[in-house]
Amino acid sequence: MSSVIVDWRRTPFSRSHKGELSEVRPDEFASQVLVELLNNLNIDPAEIDDVIVGCAYPEGEQGYNIGRLMALMSGLPKEAPGVTINRLCGSSMQAIMYASANISAGWGECFVCGGIESMSRVKRRGFNWSPHPKFETDFPEAYVNMGITAENVAELYGISRTEQEEFSLILSLIHISEPTRLAT
């Protein structure tokens, strides 16, 4: 079975720690985005097989399985499942890949996927950063950041910085859309 993305939504971007969303709980704005998405689709919420949400720092207000919480806060039936996955900066893309794999395997037909992160409400590296001492000394690359990851991928696949920037510009022009208006 083929997988297709039928719709998408996003929140406005705002400045971390000082922007319009800095005082809004991430579960609140995530559920508002899901409500708008569901209002624009002609599907029965009971048909949703799972809500799969990526989150790099699933703790604090975006912990406790925020994928499930945003499903409940959005008015989905209490039987609706939800899961939160973590692949750091690639978490939301991983959510999409998991849904696609589930569809291909015949384990469902309708999934809501996304990503949620509040850099204002949960600080970078989380609340209690405590790397394993062995990795700190023997393999610090275990905690590589997104910038280094991008450089590694670019080198591995032969993608220049200019090509990356051009691709980013094209995507931003294609995907310009009105963000979901949030109650703050």
Protein language model features and the residues they cover:
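Conserved active-site "lid/cap" helical segment
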Residues: M1-A56, G60-Q62, I66-M70, S74, ...
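Short glycine/serine/threonine-rich phosphate/pyrophosphate-binding segments
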Residues: S14-R15, G63, M93-M97, S118-K123
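Conserved functional loop/turn residues at catalytic and ligand-binding sites
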Residues: N42, I52, S92, W107, ...
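Conserved catalytic cysteine-centered active-site region
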Residues: C55-E109, P140-I148
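Flexible glycine-/small-residue-enriched beta->alpha junction loops
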Residues: S104-Y157
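Single conserved hydrophobic/aromatic residue that forms the stacking wall/gate
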Residues: I174-T184
